[in-house]
Amino acid sequence: MSYFGTDGIRGKFGQMPITPEFALKLGFAAGKVLKRTSPKNKPLVVLGKDTRLSGYILESALQAGLNAAGVYVHLLGPLPTPAIAHLTRALHAHAGIVISASHNPYFDNGIKFFSSEGKKLPDSLQEEINKELEKDLFIEDTANLGKSVRVTDANGRYIEFCKSTFPYHFDLNNLKIVVDCAHGAAYSVGPSVFRELGAKVVALYNEPDGLNINENCGSTHPESLQKAVVEHGADLGIAFDGDADRVVMVDKFGNLIDGDHILYILATQAKNKPAGVVGTVMSNMALEVALEKANVGFVRAKVGDRYVLQALEENGWVTGGEPSGHILTLDKSTTGDAIIAALQVLTVMVEQNKALHELVHDFKLYPQVLVNVRLEQMLDPYSIPALVAEFNKAEEQLKGRGRILIRKSGTEPVIRVMVEGDNEQEVKTLAEHLANAVRSQAQVA
């Protein structure tokens, strides 16, 4: 069986496969594969995590498994997922491992791998690790064990890398920024980057206790940030998710600037416009229309940053992302990076001498409603004839005026129901109707 989903291995801590025992075996299996494919006798892996309490246990287990397989480990501590991708390359490691469940609740956790290039691990290597997991764990001769060391300057290295993506002749001296860290991996480095570039920073949700990650805060819950920006009289707000690979922003009036807005800014307002942009099937139709008017290419990929990355590489483009705030700028970073994405928007603000709301003044999203239907067990909505009939009826109703999208989450038992169209009330009603239909059929199935 394959343990890897669309974004590594993920689940509830204490239940397979997110257990200390499995993490030990996974570390050993990955270590054996890396030893076979590494030009070095003892390959190096960098290992980082977000702020979940369970991350410390999984870190110890993974580290032990890797060392037992003869792999050296550099422990980075709590850092954003893109920081681990960067440090994998910067420290010339053979691979990077992140312990995180991103925007999920604290009781979930996950494990994913980066290649030596700081990109998602190729499917072929994941399959090799799967095969190795079926074998028994055995300890190498003591002389062949690996060892672990803690990297004490990991935060500083990453902060400097982020700052290097912001033009050296620009500064943020005149800006007041509220930064929502989601009690997550960017709780320290996030505010530091913007402060060191000159901004006056108000940091929110930057006191992780291992259990409060993403709890009514961060990019998935921006309401308190929207309120705080107005209360503090700030120029803008920035919200990360738990592992800081997603970002949403807020203008000075408290309006939300999501991933579609950010792509619009980078594609149409920047001094150097990209040849094309990759969105996803979730990207608002307004983005597609706006980019067409600006003579910027646009293609849709499946949901998931690995598919956006794949489409970018196929088209030879560098800019892409999702409405949720996964933004890729491949000329700056190998993976989605919330801090770097925010810095690219700030770069446009400085070079255009415009406020955030001015950059999106001419960009209006079509009404779109997304309903997440959480299930006890995952099901395929298109395998149920009654649901297919409902979907077809909705598509016919919106023909030429909008669209629907029904898809399964790749990381949790959730069916996402998205409806988009030119009439807001119709869109809301239709989305709730379809979500209720999914709930009803799930109870019957």
Curated annotation (Swiss-Prot):
It catalyses: alpha-D-glucosamine 1-phosphate = D-glucosamine 6-phosphate. Activated by phosphorylation. GO terms for cellular component: cytosol. GO terms for biological process: carbohydrate metabolic process; peptidoglycan biosynthetic process; UDP-N-acetylglucosamine biosynthetic process. The modification Phosphoserine is found at S102. The active site is at S102. Binds 1 Mg(2+) ion per subunit. One of its GO terms (molecular function) is magnesium ion binding. CDD domains: GlmM. Mg(2+) binds at S102, D241, D243, D245. It comes from the Bacteria. Its EC number is 5.4.2.10. Keywords: Isomerase, Magnesium, Metal-binding, Phosphoprotein. InterPro entries: A-D-PHexomutase_a/b/a-I, A-D-PHexomutase_a/b/a-I/II/III, A-D-PHexomutase_a/b/a-II, A-D-PHexomutase_a/b/a-III, A-D-PHexomutase_C, A-D-PHexomutase_C_sf, A-D-PHexomutase_CS, Alpha-D-phosphohexomutase_SF. HAMAP family: GlmM_B. Catalyzes the conversion of glucosamine-6-phosphate to glucosamine-1-phosphate. Belongs to the phosphohexose mutase family. This is Phosphoglucosamine mutase. It comes from Acinetobacter baumannii (strain ATCC 17978 / DSM 105126 / CIP 53.77 / LMG 1025 / NCDC KC755 / 5377). The lineage of its organism: Bacteria, Pseudomonadati, Pseudomonadota, Gammaproteobacteria, Moraxellales.
